[in-house]
Curated annotation (Swiss-Prot):
Annotated RdRp catalytic domain residues: 286-483
Record key words, sorted: Eukaryotic host gene expression shutoff by virus, Eukaryotic host transcription shutoff by virus, Host cytoplasm, Host gene expression shutoff by virus, Host nucleus, Host-virus interaction, Inhibition of host RNA polymerase II by virus, Nucleotide-binding, Nucleotidyltransferase, Phosphoprotein, RNA-directed RNA polymerase, Transferase, Viral RNA replication, Viral transcription
Protein name: RNA-directed RNA polymerase catalytic subunit
Listed Pfam families: Flu_PB1
GO molecular function terms noted in the UniProt entry: nucleotide binding; RNA binding; RNA-directed RNA polymerase activity
Residue numbers covered by motif Nuclear localization signal: 187-195, 203-216
Organism: Influenza A virus (strain A/Chile/1/1983 H1N1)
Catalytic activity: RNA(n) + a ribonucleoside 5'-triphosphate = RNA(n+1) + diphosphate
Lineage summary: Viruses, Riboviria, Orthornavirae, Negarnaviricota, Polyploviricotina
Nucleotide-binding is among the record's keywords: yes
Top-level EC class as recorded in UniProt: transferase
Family: Belongs to the influenza viruses polymerase PB1 family.
Biological role stated in the UniProt entry: RNA-dependent RNA polymerase which is responsible for replication and transcription of virus RNA segments. The transcription of viral mRNAs occurs by a unique mechanism called cap-snatching. 5' methylated caps of cellular mRNAs are cleaved after 10-13 nucleotides by PA. In turn, these short capped RNAs are used as primers by PB1 for transcription of viral mRNAs. During virus replication, PB1 initiates RNA synthesis and copy vRNA into complementary RNA (cRNA) which in turn serves as a template for the production of more vRNAs.
Amino acid sequence: MDVNPTLLFLKVPAQNAISTTFPYTGDPPYSHGTGTGYTMDTVNRTHQYSERGRWTKNTETGAPQLNPIDGPLPKDNEPSGYAQTDCVLEAMAFLEESHPGIFENSCIETMEVVQQTRVDKLTQGRQTYDWTLNRNQPAATALANTIEVFRSNGLMANESGRLIDFLKDVMDSMDREEMEITTHFQRKRRVRDNVTKKMVTQRTIGKKKHRLNKRSYLIRALTLNTMTKDAERGKLKRRAIATPGMQIRGFVYFVETLARSICEKLEQSGLPVGGNEKKAKLANVVRKMMTNSQDTEISFTITGDNTKWNENQNPRMFLAMITYITRNQPEWFRNILSIAPIMFSNKMARLGKGYMFESKSMKLRTQIPAEMLANIDLRYFNDSTRKKIEKIRPLLIDGTASLSPGMMMGMFNMLSTVLGVSILNLGQKRYTKTTYWWDGLQSSDDFALIVNAPNYAGIQAGVDRFYRTCKLLGINMSKKKSYINRTGTFEFTSFFYRYGFVANFSMELPSFGVSGINESADMSIGVTVIKNNMINNDLGPATAQMALQLFIKDYRYTYRCHRGDTQIQTRRSFEIKKLWDQTRSKTGLLVSDGGPNLYNIRNLHIPEVCLKWDLMDEDYQGRLCNPLNPFVSHKEIESVNNAVMMPAHGPAKIMEYDAVATTHSWVPKRNRSILNTSQRGILEDEQMYQRCCNLFEKFFPSSSYRRPVGISSMVEAMISRARIDARIDFESGRIKKEEFTEIMKTCSTIEELRRQK
């Protein structure tokens, strides 16, 4: 029978058909090779937007710096970064006037956070530029290396464990005439193998001390490393993103804490909330504008797009904003918040790995590191690359480019949102003093603008005024990419609004299926995704039931765990059949052990182990949840775990799922190839941290683990804990006198050894 596809839509309101327009099947594009070219593009573009600014030289590093602030106002529509200080300050003042006490209260909240935050806050986050090794590392390792170097240079404030004290060390380190660091390097030796008598290469890892003078250290401390942003859909060209080092991260964190606190109090801000909460917030603003545009007014909405938001923002402007926001606060607080923008005004962009060259005729491949770009002969490059290098050369120092204007992606999302909202706030009638007025939504660089006026001319005038106001603050609304509609239809941060937000279920499609973490997590994530989409994205019961069946099928094929009575033969089916035959209650077997699927759309919230627990054979229960099984990751599993989900569009989302530790929660082993590289030393450090942390957790099981108050080292904390526990156990008769004495003796010995060290 032929089905006419248009019949499917007869009963569907137009806005619900959005899910059928989904273009993103398949994998997103990933970048290969170096990001050097993209980074040079960013640096050159940023300088071009501010080219009529003033040039100065950094007295410490000698880096040339361009300052566009209060520069000439643009005469055309080209993007530019000439923000005017007085306009920014005035916008802040009006924002405060409309929200009395907002800055004061946010400062008080932030001050509390500043005094309580521990330095381990900086271990969150992924890749971080490690200035000691001059390349990227996981955040925790980069922090550990920084602290280790600080201590070996006599900077000890960080020992308190408070972030603010670590930042005190960062400040002191910048005044040092030199800093001594340890670098890892590799020695290769050719030796004859005793057994095979062949020559083999032996690798050993060496550590050597290396001194950085003040200038070199400052350059490293102010460096942002760059990488190419992966998995961006709908773009032909890749672009560069920045990973700042540990010196900058802590200061940025405090500024963003303040800005987040302000954003939470602003009804036009799309940050820091997300999901349904964000939709509710936005729907309120739209409702307000539509109810107020009675019969006398018309209302239009612009789905806005800004040209190169980050590259036209300026850290000097952020400094002005912070100075104003914190104007009545204690000196120490104002200082600590102003350091991040000051560091960003003096930032250096690391150009990445450099360029790959290959000569087809000579079959040669070679890498030109970024450090060589300053003085290499340019005739080897193609035209576009040659132009890039010529442009960037005056800015180069030691393979990094001086980049004073611009913000690099994703650094001050909250603070730049405050700046955007301050313009939306100026749309009230008491400020426009005319018949048109506006309001809107802002989330980092994305905005929606709602303009009300008595007639079309008024709408046009309102939009023009908004556009010009933005220019004064270094924001460039793109006339090409923004479009205007009758209020009631617009898009904001990938939410489509049409008389209410439309569920765009197809956005979630990429997160359906098997994640590939392990059998236990994958089952849990799979059903949670279906459950969440029933709650948030209009996934109907019939479709959900089908999604569930497809998921189970996919899961069984992925892990080769077809039902015990199946005819499909895989490497695993032999073992599964054996288990099936000797199990009395076959319904109790997990799907990953060849059992049946008991999930339906009513019980998706229950972890599979709990769902089947009462149906399991006793010996199966014992095997499944055996805490002594060496393959189980029993890292004090919290009842909630997080998985990173990649939707088709927009940022990666963190999704919570229930976790039950079983023999299926294995953790895949690390690839061994790292053991032969110069990173091996780092790996050994990592294992040492792991051991220390595991030991610490044995003394402080998560139930009793409160952050130690006062300043004591891990060892001191463990010793005092051991003594208390031993005394309680001895007095209640759980341990004998000899054991008690031995524990006490061991504790004293450890203390003695520490004193001698």
